[in-house]
Amino acid sequence: MSTIITAIDRHSPAEKAGIQVGEQLLTINGHTIVDVLDYRFYGYDPLSRVELKTASGDVRTVTIHKAEGQDLGLNFDTYLMDEMRSCANHCIFCFVDQMPPGMRSTLYFKDDDARLSFLLGNYITLTNLTEREAQRIIDLHISPINVSVHTTDPQLHCTMLGNKNAERSLDYIQASVSYTHLTLPTIRL
């Protein structure tokens, strides 16, 4: 987790409040900030109490007044403020495995990250989601999530994804339908 501030947008609420590059973002309005979703969700309000750890290790709190929904203006080492989550499946139809060699390396990364689904529209399988992450999707109203399902038969789902634990992703889908907009592509034969 890297919540160390690497840049601050000019004329932003954070710059006006005196936040410094090199400080670490700890909380916004009392909520621990783990990644970009926490940063966006908890920083939405017009009044934000931001807790920071200075380069010397001291902890300080800054109160920021801004427009509702206006970004605080903080930038971090990586966009997600965390590592991208990769796919744990061994799908029989994996398009990444079928790509020719010699292309740019980013094309070979098999992402399966719910945050990228929400932020960028990527499709995920939900197979590497923990109970905590599934609950967080519901709590933060993370929607929409684009899900590749392939089949709703539990045994066939596990076989096609090459993952004996893939069945639980079907449980997450069932549990999420009341709270999250899931995009499920369909194929008609």
Where are these regions (language model features)?
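Conserved Radical SAM active-site core
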Residues: K66-Y179
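Conserved PDZ fold ligand-binding element
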Residues: K16-V34
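PDZ-domain C-terminal substructure recognizer with occasional recognition of PDZ-binding tails
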Residues: R40-F76
